[in-house]
Amino acid sequence: MLFRSRIRSIDALTHLVDDPYLVGVLAMRHAVSDVWAMGASPTTALTLIAVERALSQQLEASDFVQAQAGLQDAAHAYGVEIVGGHSLSLNQPMIAVEVEGECARSVHKDGAMAGDELWITGPVGSGILFAALASGFTIGASIDQWVTNALKSLFEASQTAAREGVNAMTDVTGFGLAGHLREMLSWNNLDI
């Protein structure tokens, strides 16, 4: 009998675009990518949907239904079953997704070793984009390109890397490439 590791990860995404359905899709994709980055296949998810408190309960309900539909469609596309969740209204909309996955061999970001190569499987720079958006800058074309890239699946790349025996993997998001690389190297007192 082959032992399978269970992996869990949780991630949250604020509304970077004005389409609650698309935010639901992106939130699920963002969460499963953390599981992929550990060499696992996602299986189940719990969701938390915070819709923006509106003057109209009808608008809140509509945003919730759209976000839930985006989460469900993305979960189906990635082979994930949503097994529960919660919803609420806040001053700022947000979706959080906890994903569980399974793998024969989990790969973590603390396994980097001297002599390892750095592979980057997608574009970088989203941290700068998010910081600009948080500061009130309008960057329409860049956000559209980010959405297109964010929807691409990295499942095959992560599975191949795990099979090939890589020592460490991570999903480059919140801390940017430099931040994640620094974190990965610090575990074993490595440098570039």
Regions found by a protein language model. Name each.
Residues 1-192:
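Helix-biased detector of long, well-ordered alpha-helical tracts
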